[in-house]
Amino acid sequence: MKINTVLFDLDGTLINTNELIISSFLHTLNHYYSNQYKREDVLPFIGPSLHDTFSKIDASKVEEMITCYRQFNHEHHDELVEEYETVYETVQELKKQGYKIGIVTTKARQTVEMGLKLSKLDQFFDVVVTIDDVEHVKPHPEPLQKALELLDAKPEETLMVGDNHHDIVGGQNAGTKTVAVSWTLKGRAYLEAYKPDYVLDKMSDLLPILSRING
């Protein structure tokens, strides 16, 4: 089966928002629980929705913690977000070759648009599905299914590319092929345990993989 559609996660996959996310969590948690959380403590919070994460910490303060997080995140966005090598060129080439390309992210649309504009990737994507567009987040298949529906694409003709197990399992649940990125903050072995179909060392590795699949 040939591939004609590629879906990407955003944070940690297309743009390096790791420092922004970690700093936003530390700022928020230190505000409520002074000096109780260190950098390594917040790494597991990367991937799930803010609502899920803060619910487990204190269900009564979820909304105010999300507000605190987002305020810091927006204020420091442009200074803390970095590019990943070969991402721009690869996405540009996929578009040029006629692939349908989309983003499936657990972020809110406003912050997604900030990241895409900063990285100049906003011109390429046919569809962007955010947490604002769905009831369930990855690894539930709903966000991917929504993107596929909007793109008029079939799961068996689609790759899902991501840096977290939510992306890989989400792709598997939706019936797509899955691609893990080795630059995940959680380490290559962590993602390989979820048995993705392919692993990239850099984003441009995606192009020869697609050439091989589509022969």
Swiss-Prot record:
Documented EC number(s): 3.6.1.1
UniProt superkingdom: Bacteria
GO molecular function annotations of the record: inorganic diphosphate phosphatase activity; magnesium ion binding; phosphoglycolate phosphatase activity
Annotated catalytic residues: D9 (nucleophile)
Keywords recorded for this protein, A-Z: Hydrolase, Magnesium
Cofactor: Mg(2+)
Catalytic activity entry: diphosphate + H2O = 2 phosphate + H(+)
Function: Hydrolyzes pyrophosphate formed during P-Ser-HPr dephosphorylation by HPrK/P. Might play a role in controlling the intracellular pyrophosphate pool.
Record family assignment: Belongs to the HAD-like hydrolase superfamily. PpaX family.
Name assigned to this protein: Pyrophosphatase PpaX
Organism: Bacillus mycoides (strain KBAB4)
